[in-house]
């Protein structure tokens, strides 16, 4: 009989074998804070226009070279439960605002770092949390007073371009003026009268070659495809969209045919050909001159399409089909039947074009009232174009935020220093122990201009002392001058470096919530992971006989 070793009395006795648990300040709270600090430190160096890029190779061996925090976090696949909370907060910021994910991470990381100092000084966790929550509430009350201007006309391309400048600049420093103009043109052209802007209506098509300056905007859609038949250009296009293959019907049963003489052999496929001819003719007679199909195109069907001058475009992606239907106002048909006038889509022209050495099909709307706009990105490498796409994505999201709330606050660390100054004053008026936490919360705001300065290679302490000096004189809009050689400051409103009010509001709120949630954890209980050992990686034939 096997010797039974009793479990040690206490909490472990209740749990299954292999489960782990950590409790108390040292084991749980400080460990969690350490993990969050490490994560925030990783993305902190990527903050701002002069932020460094990260090279991430994910589990599928895809290479990412970017300074976009949302992409870095998505591909890192963070496992630590406390660090995951910070990742979730930044994902919430991504969904809510579409920009400012790095702000959430950096700010939450510094809040936790300063909370650790307070806990080691002897404050209790509840006092730190209470102080942080009071300070956060106060910060969100002060924020509306820091608004320096509002967007006046969201249908003016030049004004919109100047407002998108900052969000694009942090991803593509040097190309921001050109890209923000492109994004503004695309967004303004499809802004509906209701003002409800949909981010998905701005599409991106990436084609290798030339440079960023060769990028352009098209009203309509661009597909990285070639046409199937002989017709490559149609003006005043009427499009029929099919989600099925462009082919004759095939029976589900076996089609075995017994042929007795030569005449039967000659007439065998005539019926099929006539049927195909009638089907394609019916589509052409309905007025359609462009056919878009989601499946394969049969040779015989293609022959008759050429005969009746139909342009054939094949799209493999059902998402592309849906977006095209939205662009041209068509209904996707499940069978090869002639479309009615209501089911047909319409656009000014459909043509095959050559961009660089790549063939693309363009569905173009001449009027600027199309449902979808496409930004055609050019660049020397795929990684560069991916990064430009992320900058475009941030710009489009910023435009969406402006359609919801037109208020803007000064960027470049100006808002943060003003908040730090006012919350420190508020902390002085609080009598309890939570005043220490309130002052630390104010100190945490310094991390943003500090990160901007450090990433620009400037002495951070010098920048922060200069900013405080200017803000004490009442200049709320003065922030760090990122383009100066030394530690210099300038008016952000005059320089046009502005952040959205909603981006800051949600950033502060989500970062504080994430930090407080991590601090509230005093015990970690982990079950033993299910499943056996993972197969060894690298050897693709590890389960085959090695002696062959």
UniProtKB/Swiss-Prot annotation:
One GO term describing the cellular component: cell projection
Binding-site list for ATP: 100-102, 170-171, 412, 499, 504
List of residues binding ADP: 47-48, 100-103, 169-171, 412, 499
Sites of N-acetylalanine modification: 2
Main location: cytoplasm
The keyword NADP is annotated on this UniProt entry: no
Modified residues (Phosphotyrosine): 505
Name of the protein this chain belongs to: T-complex protein 1 subunit theta
